[in-house]
Amino acid sequence: MKIVLPVISGIFAILAGALAAQAQMKLPDLKKQPSAQAVLDEHFAALNKCDWNRLLAQYPEDAQINLPNGTIVKGRAAIGDLFAGFCKEPKDGGLNGIQFAVEHSTTIENTFATQWVATAPFLAEPYRGSDAYITHDGFMQAMVTTFDGSALKMKK
């Protein structure tokens, strides 16, 4: 319990900061992609540039992201908050500069089961994970991720 409380407090602090930042950011117009593969490619390209507008242009209002430990982020505004925190500079608690590379991906209709590796100048070692990306009608409808920022090993 001693470890869980600071972690939960840290998550709430990051989300509160992201909410404040999001209040100043307008959600971008949706941008439909021509194929499921184009949705996935755009996601990784936007994520690697920490391009908040491009990321959010993929997610319709009823989208959701399932995070580890049972957390579900629902709706564009909440997803915007999540990525606003993620795209902060490392000195501000974000991960801007992290690069995700697909190592393996299996496609089943409009869903991708994707193994990736993340690297960054501020990481002590590569971090691997796996996500399911569910696309629908040219958008990112849902994502199930194993990404756990607290498991990243940062350089000292």
PLM features per residue range, with description:
Residues I8-A18:
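Bacterial N-terminal signal peptides
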Residues H43, L55-L56, A63, G75, ...:
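Hydrophobic pocket/interface hotspot
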Residues P126-K156:
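Short beta-strand edge/turn micro-motifs at domain boundaries
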Residues A20-A57, E61, M154:
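Short, low-complexity N-terminal intrinsically disordered segments enriched in polar/charged residues
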Residues D81-P126:
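Surface-exposed, charged secondary-structure patches
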Residues A63-K74, K88-G93:
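A short gly/proline-enriched turn/hairpin at secondary-structure junctions
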Residues Y59, A118-A120, T146-F147:
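Short beta-strand segments enriched in hydrophobic/aromatic residues
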Residues M1-S9:
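Bacterial N-terminal signal peptides that target proteins for export
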